[in-house]
């Protein structure tokens, strides 16, 4: 009858079996802890009571029952000396007994753990994902701890750099424009995959010049995406993975500006409304905003595809002015003056013949100096000829009137007449 009833009984589920095993494991672990505590308690009690008994018996024997014979005293001494050895032996027996109990308990515990692990492996193979996940989270805390350790530690929130959000928006818009199909009938099934692929690109793109992005495995849908006619050869998956490149050619002004910023922009004449966007000719990415004055003359390298965008116009250059070095002119005039002072005037006239117009342009001071020099030479010649005449023709008139024989006054008159003629 019992066998028939056992056949009709329902087989316990894996959850019930695991619950029963969990209870047995907990009881065995509690028993192991209790066993260790009991061993310490019993050993301590043994030492405590044995020492008290040893002291009391030794005092009573010494005070009241000490025998008079020598042999009886030796026997009592042997008994007292063997008592500590007996206590030590009892202590070892207690330790061995408790250790055997703990070993048996540990063996049963290990057996239950191995069976539990086998059942959990069967659950992972046979049960559905949801049921297996619930069972593992409930009955396998060790694996849950390992998974928690393997998960990355959440770091501080990373503030996007200026231009990063704009870059992500442009990348997402470019992906949407690339992946839109030509046929309107095929548009609806491709939208969910496209929307799922867009956040991954937004997560993986980073600001130019920043740390390298995490490696992204290209999804099969991103490989299926077709390029637009006239679009660059770079694919969407390749654009998300690249090393840190050059910085933006010009900064991107923030969208959210305060009242003070707007007032300053109005006074200075700067702001987004007064700037032009630098768009790459190859990948159509936003590379900052340049001023109106420099927009036509800016050449920049794209921060995303590294394409060199030439300037639309060449900046006009003003003609170079002739450099006038005043120090060199002063040195030349000084050297010419020193050479003219060393050379005689005749040699200067031969080496540097001047035109009559240049002669007329000479200053009157130079003419006066030349006239004075000629007068001085004439007077010297007259003074040299005067003593010779006096020696050859000595006249009484000269002896009587020496003042009249002085030829200096007529010479002075002649010099004045020559000076007037030269003027």
Swiss-Prot record:
Broad class of where this protein is predominantly found: endoplasmic reticulum
Residue ranges annotated as Lumenal topological domain: 67-77
Skewed-composition ranges (Acidic residues): 370-391, 414-423
Post-translational modification, as annotated: Phosphorylated. Phosphorylation at Thr-159 occurs during interphase. Phosphorylation at Ser-177, Ser-179, Ser-188, Thr-198, Ser-206, Ser-215, Thr-219, Ser-222 and Ser-231 occurs during mitosis; these phosphorylations reduce both its homodimerization and the ER three-way tubular junction formation.
Membrane-side (Cytoplasmic) residue stretches: 1-45, 99-423
Residues recorded with modification Phosphoserine: 177, 179, 188, 206, 215, 222, 231
GO BP annotation list: endoplasmic reticulum tubular network maintenance; positive regulation of endoplasmic reticulum tubular network organization
GO molecular function, one term: identical protein binding
Protein name, entry field: Endoplasmic reticulum junction formation protein lunapark
Organism of provenance: Xenopus tropicalis
């Amino acid at each position: 009858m019992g066998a028939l009833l056992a056949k009709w009984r329902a087989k316990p589920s894996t959850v019930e079996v695991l619950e029963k095993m969990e209870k047995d494991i907990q009881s065995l672990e509690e028993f192991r802890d209790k066993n260790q505590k009991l061993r310490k308690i019993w050993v301590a009690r043994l030492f405590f009571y044995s020492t008290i008994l040893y002291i009391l018996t030794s005092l009573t024997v010494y005070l009241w029952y000490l025998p008079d014979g020598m042999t009886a005293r030796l026997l009592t001494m042997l008994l007292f000396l063997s008592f500590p050895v007996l206590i030590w032996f009892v202590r070892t027996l207690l330790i061995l007994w408790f250790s055997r109990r703990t070993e048996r308990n540990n063996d049963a515990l290990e057996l239950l753990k191995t069976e539990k692990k086998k059942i959990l492996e069967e659950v992972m193979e046979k049960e559905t994902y949801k049921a297996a996940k619930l069972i593992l989270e409930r009955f396998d805390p060790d694996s849950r701890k390992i998974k928690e350790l393997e998960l990355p530690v959440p770091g501080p929130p990373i503030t996007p750099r200026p231009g990063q959000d704009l870059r992500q928006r442009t990348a997402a818009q470019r992906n949407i424009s690339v992946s839109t199909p030509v046929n309107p009938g095929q548009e609806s099934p491709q939208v969910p995959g496209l929307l799922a692929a867009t956040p991954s690109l937004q997560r993986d793109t980073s600001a130019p010049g920043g740390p390298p992005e995490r490696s992204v495995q290209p999804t099969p849908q991103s490989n299926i995406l077709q390029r637009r006619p006239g679009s660059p050869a770079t694919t969407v998956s390749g654009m998300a993975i690249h090393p840190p490149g050059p910085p933006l050619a010009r900064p991107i002004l923030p969208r959210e500006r305060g009242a003070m910023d707007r007032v300053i922009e109005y006074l200075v004449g700067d702001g987004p409304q007064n700037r032009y966007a630098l768009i790459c000719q190859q990948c159509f990415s936003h590379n900052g905003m340049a001023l109106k004055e420099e927009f036509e003359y800016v050449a920049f390298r794209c921060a995303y595809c590294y394409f060199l965008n030439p300037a639309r116009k060449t900046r006009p250059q003003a003609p170079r002015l002739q450099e006038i070095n005043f120090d060199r002119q002063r040195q030349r005039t000084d050297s010419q003056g020193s050479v003219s002072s060393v050379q005689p005037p005749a040699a200067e006239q031969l080496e540097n013949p001047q035109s009559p117009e240049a002669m007329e342009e000479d200053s009157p001071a130079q003419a006066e100096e030349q006239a004075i020099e000629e007068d001085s030479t004439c007077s010297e010649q007259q003074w040299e000829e005067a003593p010779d005449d006096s020696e050859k023709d000595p006249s009484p008139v000269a002896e009587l009137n020496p003042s009249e024989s002085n030829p200096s006054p007529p010479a002075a008159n002649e010099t004045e007449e020559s000076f007037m003629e030269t003027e």
